[in-house]
Every structure is written in structure tokens, then in C-alpha cells.
Amino acid sequence: MWLLGPLCLLLSSAAESQLLPGNNFTNECNIPGNFMCSNGRCIPGAWQCDGLPDCFDKSDEKECPKAKSKCGPTFFPCASGIHCIIGRFRCNGFEDCPDGSDEENCTANPLLCSTARYHCKNGLCIDKSFICDGQNNCQDNSDEESCESSQEPGSGQVFVTSENQLVYYPSITYAIIGSSVIFVLVVALLALVLHHQRKRNNLMTLPVHRLQHPVLLSRLVVLDHPHHCNVTYNVNNGIQYVASQAEQNASEVGSPPSYSEALLDQRPAWYDLPPPPYSSDTESLNQADLPPYRSRSGSANSASSQAASSLLSVEDTSHSPGQPGPQEGTAEPRDSEPSQGTEEV
């Protein structure tokens, strides 16, 4: 690609050497189809009256027949009859037509040089936005003479160089503002969704954490006044109870005393009395005072005799309640001694 530049220069120089008069190929201008400029340069005949000056003296565009304009009502036809420009570009200080016909006879039209435009000293009229923009729009530098130093080129101030750019500035501004508002709304909505999702995840993982770290019942304290305590929940340590200062003082005052303190403070009245006198007569008991010894078989016989006597007494009462039975008298002396022995034992 970098070889194309020098190659084009060589070809153009060779073509000019062939077309220029005075060289070995000066007779080529006599060939039909070529056009000789007023300065003696030869150009192809197709370049004549094409709306673009190819000769240095613009002789190829002189005495050309003007074609009928085909431009619309809002366009300005150039003098060549080939090109059309936007109507507001006429007499704006720039040659928009290739032949510069859009900047000719500008002072003759009062509408184009109205008070809304800037009148140059040479008679041209330009838009007021072109004043002090750092460019010679009036072609006599009259639009840059009365400018302040702060508005000189290179001061960082942005200037508008054409009227069509003013039309696009509001739309660009509105587009930037709308995009910024949409971006802020999207970011806020995304942040709200993320916050809601994180909160939901924390609520879902809380029961699992409680299963992994069960709460010990021994660490829980039940109080009569729960509003005097502070209960904090920690993810790592579980439930923690922090009592208030007043409750701690009350618990210290109302706590039961120790075993040794209770014995010293609450001794009975007889604790300090002297012991009773020692008597040796009480320990020696006579064998006659003791009840007779009864074996286990004897006690069983006495129990059976008592049961039999109770049955006989029931039968006697059923026959004659007022008279004792015949066997009641015989059974009573025999059972009196065993019953007495069992009761005393």
C-alpha cells in the first residue's frame, strides 16, 4: 500500500510532461478530444465544462453553455448548471459551488444581506455565528478584527462553522440527557434487585445455620421481667443474654446464702444448750420387763387363730346378735395371749 503513493506521483508527473507544451509531446493537444488551456496546458476534453476548474486560469469553464437547472425549490443551482447546493448556503462566506457562483452578487439581494447577518467590509454577508471563529469568512478578515483576546483561536472556545450544525446540537443534547436518565434508572433498578436478592438469601440460610448451631437450653435464662434485659443475637455465638445493672444488683441481693452461712445464721434454740446428764440406770433394763419372745411359727399360728376367731364371731352375730356363740368363749382365751404377744412385739 505504501508503494501506491510514489507510483501515483510518477504517473501524474509523466502525464503532465506529456501534456505540457514545450516537451516532446506538445503535438498531443492537436489530437481531437483534448483541450488546451489559455496558459498552454493540455487537459482531456471531458474535463471541459464539467463544473470544476481544471486549468490554472479556469479557462476550461469559461464560455460554457449553461444547462437548465434541475434543482428543487429549496436548493440553489450553481452557475455550471450541474451542481445544486442548499439554499441557505448561498452567500454564507464559503464557496459551496465548485465555480463559486453561490458567493456572487450577494449584496444585490436584500433578503440575503438582512440585519440577521453580518455585513463584511467588502460587501459580503455571512452568518453572525461565523464572527470571531478564527477563520477569514469575509475574505477581507473584517469578521476577525474586532474580536477579544479571549475569543482568539486556540482559547478552547467551541465555534460553529456552519448553520447546519446548529440544527443537530439540540437533538444531540436531548439524546445525551435521555441516555443519562435511562442509565441512572437502570443502575438504580439493578441495585434494588441485588439488595432484595441478598436479603432473601440471608433469610433462607438462617434456619440452616440454626440447625448447625443448636441453642442450648442451659444458656437460656427465663426472667419475670423481660423488659429489663437485653437479648442480642450473633450469627457465630447464638443468643446472648445481657442483664441490666439493676437486675444484677437485685439478683445479688436476693440470692440464697451458702450452706455454711445458713447453718451459722439459722441455728435452732436448743443448739447452744448443754447436753442432758448421763444416767447408767436407764441403760440396764430388767429381763422381766421385756415381752416374751415369739418365734416366727408362733406368730403365724396366732395370726391364723385370730382369723378363725373373726369368722366365728361373724357367724354368731348372724344367728343371735345378743347371745355369744358356743365357740367364742373357748377361742378367746387361746387367742388372747398370741394376739397380746404380737401387738407388743
From Swiss-Prot:
**Where does the record place Low complexity bias?**
295-313
Question: Which residue spans belong to the Extracellular compartment?
Answer: 18-173
Q: Where is this region: (Microbial infection) Interaction with Venezuelan equine encephalitis virus/VEEV spike proteins E1 and E2?
A: 30-57
Task: List the membrane topology term(s).
Answer: Single-pass type I membrane protein
Question: Which positions fall inside the LDL-receptor class A domain?
Answer: 28-65, 70-107, 112-148
Cystines in this chain = C29-C42, C37-C55, C49-C64, C71-C84, C78-C97, C91-C106, C113-C125, C120-C138, C132-C147
BP term (GO), one: receptor-mediated endocytosis
Top-rank taxon? Eukaryota
Key words of the record: Cell membrane, Disulfide bond, Glycoprotein, Host-virus interaction, Lipoprotein, Membrane, Receptor, Repeat, Signal, Transmembrane, Transmembrane helix
State the compartments where it is located: Cell membrane
| GO CC terms of this entry | plasma membrane
Q: Quick check: keyword Glycoprotein in the entry? A: yes
Impact after mutating Y259A: Does not affect interaction with ITCH. Loss of interaction with ITCH
Pfam families per record: Ldl_recept_a
Which residues are listed as membrane-spanning?
174-194
Location of the region described as Disordered in the Swiss-Prot/TrEMBL record: 270-345
- What is known about the tissue distribution of this protein? Expressed at high levels in brain, lung, skeletal muscle, and pancreas. Expressed at moderate levels in heart, placenta, and kidney but not detected in the liver.
Pinpoint motif Involved in ITCH interaction by residue range: 256-259, 275-278
Q: Which residues form the signal peptide?
A: 1-17
Primary localization: membrane
Q: What is the effect of changing D50G?
A: Loss of infection by Venezuelan equine encephalitis virus
What are the GO MF terms of this UniProt record?
amyloid-beta binding
- Family membership: Belongs to the LDLR family.
PANTHER family, sorted: LOW-DENSITY LIPOPROTEIN RECEPTOR CLASS A DOMAIN-CONTAINING PROTEIN 3 (PTHR24270:SF24), LOW-DENSITY LIPOPROTEIN RECEPTOR-RELATED (PTHR24270)
Free-text function comment from the UniProt entry: May influence APP processing, resulting in a decrease in sAPP-alpha production and increased amyloidogenic P3 peptide production. May regulate ITCH and NEDD4 E3 ligase activity and degradation. (Microbial infection) Acts as a receptor for Venezuelan equine encephalitis virus.
Protein name listed in UniProt: Low-density lipoprotein receptor class A domain-containing protein 3
Identify the species of origin. Answer: Homo sapiens (Human)
